[in-house]
C-alpha cells in the first residue's frame, strides 16, 4: 500500500492557492493574463452605469454592483452599505464563477473608484487576499490604449468558493473608541474636508471623530484616473500625521470612500482596518466624541 508522509498528505489535501497577485495591476499585465485559466474580471458600477457595461467592457468581464450585491439591503433607519453575512457573499461570488483557485481583477468605468475599492475590501474580507487586484486607470485607460473591448456578456459557470472571513479587517465603534488615544493606531477620515471641518453634514452631527486625521479620498487618484505614486501617497499620509508602523483605521460617511484610503494604506504597507459603520454609525451615538464643528 502506497503511503505519503504527513506533510505531503496535508499539502495534497489543502485547498489550491493561486500565486499572490499584486493589488494594483497595469493594463499591460491584464492584457498578458486576460486568458489565464481561473481569471475572473469584474467591471464595477451600479444601475446608472449598467448601460455602459452593456455597450462596452473588457472582453470576458462581468458586471458587479457592490452597492447592491455586496451590501445589506437598504432599510429605513438602518446603516447603509454594511457587509452582509458570509453566506450571502459566498452565494454571490459562486454565482459569478468565483472558486478557490480564482484570481480576480476589478476595474472601474466612468471613474467609479470608491465602489471598486469597496469591492476589493469585501473580497479581501472574504479571504481572497493576495488574489484580488485593481486595474490602474480602469476602462478609460484600457480604451485609451486601443485595447479590445466587447459588448458580449460572458457565459458563466458557477464556482465553488470556500470563504475564510477576515474579521480583523473590520473595525466597529467599540474598537475606534478604545483606540482614540492609542499612539499605535491612527483614525483617518476619508471624507471631503468640508465634512471633516464641519461645514457640511450628512449624519446630523458636524465635524469628525475626535482626533481623526484627514486624508480625503479624492487625493488618492490623479486626474487621469490612476493611483498616485507610492511616494506621493506616503507624503500625503505623513502630512496628515500618520506614521509608519501605525495601524490605520479609515472611515467616511457609509464605508465606501474610506475603502479607497484603506486600499492606499494597504499599498503602502500599513496594517489597515475599515470602520464599516463609519460616521453614519458614530454620529448617531450621542456619547461618542465629535470635534471640528463650525458655528
Features from the language model and the residues they span:
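Helix-loop module immediately N-terminal to the HCX5R catalytic loop
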Residues: 73-102, 217-248
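Mature N-terminal segment immediately following signal peptide/propeptide cleavage
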Residues: 20-48, 60-66
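Active-site neighborhoods of enzymes that stabilize oxyanions during catalysis
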Residues: 19-26, 32, 72, 139-210, ...
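Hydrophobic h-region of N-terminal signal peptides that target proteins for export
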Residues: 2-19
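Loop/turn elements at helix/coil->beta-strand transitions in domains of secreted/extracellular proteins
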Residues: 36-40, 59, 100-103, 183-186, ...
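Thiolate-centered catalytic microenvironments shared by cysteine-dependent enzyme domains
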Residues: 80-175, 179, 200, 257-273, ...
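C-terminal soluble interaction/assembly domains
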Residues: 233-235, 240-295
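Solvent-exposed loop/turn segments at secondary-structure junctions
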Residues: 46-49, 67-71, 110-114, 139-141, ...
Amino acid at each position: 500500500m502506497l503511503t505519503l508522509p504527513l506533510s505531503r498528505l496535508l499539502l495534497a489535501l489543502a485547498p489550491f492557492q493561486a500565486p499572490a497577485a499584486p493589488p494594483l495591476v497595469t493594463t499591460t499585465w491584464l492584457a498578458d493574463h486576460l486568458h489565464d485559466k481561473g481569471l475572473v474580471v469584474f467591471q464595477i458600477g451600479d444601475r446608472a452605469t449598467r448601460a455602459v457595461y452593456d455597450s462596452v467592457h473588457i472582453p470576458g468581464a462581468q458586471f458587479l454592483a457592490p452597492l447592491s450585491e455586496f451590501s445589506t439591503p437598504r432599510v429605513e433607519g438602518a446603516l447603509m452599505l454594511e457587509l452582509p453575512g458570509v453566506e450571502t457573499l459566498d452565494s454571490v461570488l459562486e454565482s459569478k464563477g468565483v472558486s478557490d483557485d480564482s484570481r480576480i481583477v476589478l476595474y472601474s468605468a466612468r471613474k467609479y473608484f470608491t465602489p471598486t475599492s469597496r469591492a476589493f475590501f469585501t473580497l479581501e474580507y472574504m479571504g481572497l487576499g493576495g488574489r484580488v487586484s485593481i486595474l490602474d486607470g480602469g476602462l478609460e485607460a484600457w480604451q485609451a490604449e486601443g485595447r479590445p473591448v466587447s459588448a458580449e456578456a460572458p457565459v458563466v459557470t458557477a464556482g465553488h468558493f470556500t470563504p475564510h472571513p477576515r474579521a480583523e479587517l473590520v473595525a466597529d465603534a467599540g474598537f475606534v473608541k478604545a483606540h482614540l488615544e492609542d499612539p499605535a493606531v491612527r483614525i483617518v477620515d476619508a471624507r471631503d474636508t468640508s465634512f471633516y471641518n464641519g461645514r457640511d453634514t450628512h449624519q446630523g452631527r458636524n465635524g469628525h471623530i475626535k482626533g481623526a486625521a484627514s486624508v480625503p479620498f479624492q487625493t488618492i487618484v490623479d486626474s487621469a484616473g490612476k493611483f498616485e505614486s507610492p511616494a506621493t501617497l506616503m507624503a500625503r499620509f505623513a502630512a496628515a500625521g500618520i506614521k509608519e508602523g501605525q495601524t490605520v483605521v479609515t472611515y467616511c460617511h457609509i464605508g465606501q470612500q474610506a475603502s479607497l484610503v484603506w486600499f492606499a494604506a494597504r499599498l503602502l504597507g500599513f496594517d489597515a482596518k475599515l470602520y464599516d459603520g463609519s460616521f453614519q454609525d458614530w454620529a448617531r451615538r450621542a456619547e461618542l466624541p465629535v470635534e471640528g464643528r463650525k458655528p
